[in-house]
């Protein structure tokens, strides 16, 4: 389990070129383009699960997230780009207003088709961020594992998650750029698309989400946690007046789920 300290901000579409140039100068690192498919799973309401752990403590059911990268040539619909590289301005400017270039059937196929059983997935569970009105950064405990291969009679990600007692909840795609700053500070700037079976909606139309974070390997490493917080606050000060970094709403980052009667009857 690691601790992730983070801050978030937003920028408008028209501000992206200046943002990219400014962060490139500040960090001294180039923008790395990425596209990720994020699939969120909820506890299967058909199963009766004991919510008490071995210490007789109440454990609330939580969602799990699986993530994998999407080949950028699929985003651009250009197989040549795989060898020639992808320009971040080209891919993000192209996707500001146009429809998402990948059909939702292709994305659902990645989790339901046995022929995709060699796709690597990162499985993540997360606690609700630490409470406290005086917190200057968000702090969240995260656990990650890697699914490198799905086996069995029906080797799909959906079947693997079903065997773990989870069913599909929703999925989304993030496409953006990543910068690596000093002292392990990572900066992501991306757009988000909500993927449903009947349509794809750009949630961030007109702008981008900016997420900066530091990951600390041990929750007991107080010195490292304090240093990570100081580095994030330093970046916040450096970009004040241009980016308004804030602590994200902890409730929006809560992976716990309360199963209602409506959920059970679906």
Swiss-Prot record:
Q: For this protein, what is any one GO molecular function term?
A: RNA polymerase II core promoter sequence-specific DNA binding
Keywords on record? Activator, Nucleus, Transcription, Transcription regulation
Name its cellular compartments. Answer: Nucleus
Name the GO terms of the biological process aspect.
cellular response to heat; positive regulation of transcription elongation by RNA polymerase II; positive regulation of transcription initiation by RNA polymerase II; RNA polymerase II preinitiation complex assembly; termination of RNA polymerase II transcription; transcription open complex formation at RNA polymerase II promoter
- Cite the Pfam families for this sequence: Med18
Q: What is its main location?
A: nucleus
Q: Which domain of life is it from?
A: Eukaryota
Q: Which GO terms describe its cellular component?
A: core mediator complex; mediator complex
Checking InterPro entries in the record gives: Mediator_Med18
User: What interactions and quaternary structure are annotated?
Assistant: Component of the Mediator complex.
> Into which family does the record put it?
Belongs to the Mediator complex subunit 18 family.
Q: Which PANTHER family match?
A: MEDIATOR OF RNA POLYMERASE II TRANSCRIPTION SUBUNIT 18, MEDIATOR OF RNA POLYMERASE II TRANSCRIPTION, SUBUNIT 18
Chain's role: Component of the Mediator complex, a coactivator involved in the regulated transcription of nearly all RNA polymerase II-dependent genes. Mediator functions as a bridge to convey information from gene-specific regulatory proteins to the basal RNA polymerase II transcription machinery. Mediator is recruited to promoters by direct interactions with regulatory proteins and serves as a scaffold for the assembly of a functional preinitiation complex with RNA polymerase II and the general transcription factors.
Q: What is this protein called?
A: Mediator of RNA polymerase II transcription subunit 18
What organism does the record attribute this protein to? Candida glabrata (strain ATCC 2001 / BCRC 20586 / JCM 3761 / NBRC 0622 / NRRL Y-65 / CBS 138)
């Amino acid at each position: 389990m690691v601790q992730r300290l983070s801050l978030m901000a937003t920028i408008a579409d028209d501000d992206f070129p200046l943002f990219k140039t400014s962060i490139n100068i500040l960090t001294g690192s180039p923008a790395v383009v990425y596209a990720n498919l994020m699939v969120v799973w909820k506890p299967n309401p058909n199963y009766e699960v004991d919510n008490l752990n071995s210490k007789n403590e109440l454990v609330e059911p939580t969602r799990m997230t699986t993530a994998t990268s999407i080949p950028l040539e699929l985003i651009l619909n250009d197989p040549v780009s795989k060898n020639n590289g992808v320009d971040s301005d080209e891919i993000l400017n192209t996707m500001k207003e146009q429809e998402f270039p990948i059909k939702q059937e292709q994305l659902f196929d990645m989790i339901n088709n046995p022929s995709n059983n060699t796709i690597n997935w990162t499985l993540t569970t997360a606690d609700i961020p630490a409470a406290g009105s005086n917190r200057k950064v968000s702090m969240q405990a995260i656990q990650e594992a890697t699914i490198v291969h799905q086996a069995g009679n029906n080797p799909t990600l959906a079947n693997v998650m079903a065997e773990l007692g989870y069913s599909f909840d929703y999925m989304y795609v993030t496409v953006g750029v990543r910068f690596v700053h000093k002292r392990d500070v990572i900066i992501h700037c991306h757009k988000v698309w909500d993927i449903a079976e009947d349509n794809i909606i750009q949630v961030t139309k007109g702008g981008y989400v900016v997420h900066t974070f530091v990951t600390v390997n041990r929750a007991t490493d107080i010195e490292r946690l304090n240093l990570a917080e100081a580095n994030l606050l330093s970046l916040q000060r450096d970009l004040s007046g241009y980016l308004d970094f804030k602590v994200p709403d902890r409730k929006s980052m809560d992976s716990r789920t309360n199963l209602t009667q409506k959920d059970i009857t679906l």
